[in-house]
Amino acid sequence: MQLHFLSIVSQKEIMRFPLLFLCLLSVQPLVAEDYPPGTFEYTPRVDLGLRPVVVDRLPERTLNLPAGFKVRFFSGEVNHARFMAFDENDVLHVGNFNTQRSGYWHKDPWRDATVLAMPDFNRDGQADRVYVAADDLQLPHSIAFYKGHMYVADHDKIYKMYDGDGDGYYEQREKLISVPGIMNRPSEHITHTLLFDEQKEKLYLHVGSGCDLCREDDPERATIMQFNTDGTERRIYASGIRNAVGLDLHPITGQLWAAGHGHDREGRSLPPEWVSIILPDTFHGWPFAYAYRSWIDFSDPVYSKEILPITAQDSALVRKMQRPTVLVDAHLGPMGLHFYTHEQFPQRYKNAAFIAFHAGTGSSFDPGYKVSVIFSNPDGTNARIADFMTGFRPDPDKGFYWAQPMGLVTDSEGYLYMSSDLVTPGIFRIEYDPQ
């Protein structure tokens, strides 16, 4: 097992206090759960011994997976595939942005975006056909099925959809919830992820910030919201969350986990991206701090103009921050977060969390563009992270990448599906065959 240790001082501090830095290197690295406020540790890494595997139905492409795993290209009949969900008949559905005319990060004024259905009734690992299950949408990022209905998160509302005649097309809808939508501001976050907690009969919804770093006028931005499943009892469940696209419930504890994005303007290595257990009424740092109470560098004139002065209330919020469960390299863009609960994969993956990293640009030390897996105790302690599927960026020293991991989901048989929204839009299926 390979452990990565992060110095708790910046490069400027190393230059100012070289003896202090040498002392830090001479002591044992802190356990990831034990580091003090104002510092942070990257989560230790595990090496799964990835091997090259040719992608079935994409013979010109190779990905790297642990021994015994293989990957198929399930379908490429999609414009920009976002998050996925299976209905009660085990038919895969995927949110499909149609941005050929409107631009990728703008709502579609023609309302050409759709939800696509991709049945695989003969179970050969390839979609039998692809058809429109719902249309007249703008940015349908996230989908969920609950008690026979399909729920779709568009940029400004959550729809509850009905398939009255059972033909697979959801011809009726009602607006369940209105949410903060697009404001056409720089660096705003425009998608929403929804998640049902069937045990507690609650609905969670991530609402990203309307900027990279600023003081929001709308208290519901940069939060995770909670509702009853009928849309009532609206409340802010947790705040200080710039953009937590990945949401899932731990299969043992039932606790909400989220994967979040850090701010943009603090260099190649800061701030780390994170995964955390999200408890009710907690604050997670934005726009003042990151990781475990590490203050943002407000010497940046853009940030200082937006945030300063820091108030006593701001400081009190930062003092409430808890250590994240997982910290990884900056700017990797964590997207889908999915706990694996099936038996098809080896036992070590049972109840582990898979996470899709959508980015890994020149601003990051990690090549990115990959799927990783988090191993931990149910309460998040003793967390370790491992690369599970890499190769979308074949040469880390070059900018070329041929797909961007987005969503993750499993079917009833335990196959893992990954969507890619750009370069090679489509759905990939990962399966385990030790032979």
Residue ranges and their predicted role:
Residues 87-89, 145-147, 196-200, 251-253, ...:
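Residue-level detector of Asp-centered blade-edge/turn motifs that repeat once per structural unit
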Residues 34-66, 191, 209-212, 222, ...:
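Beta-propeller domain segments
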Residues 75-77, 132-136, 177-185, 236-240, ...:
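Surface loop/turn motifs at the tips and blade-to-blade linkers of beta-strand repeat domains
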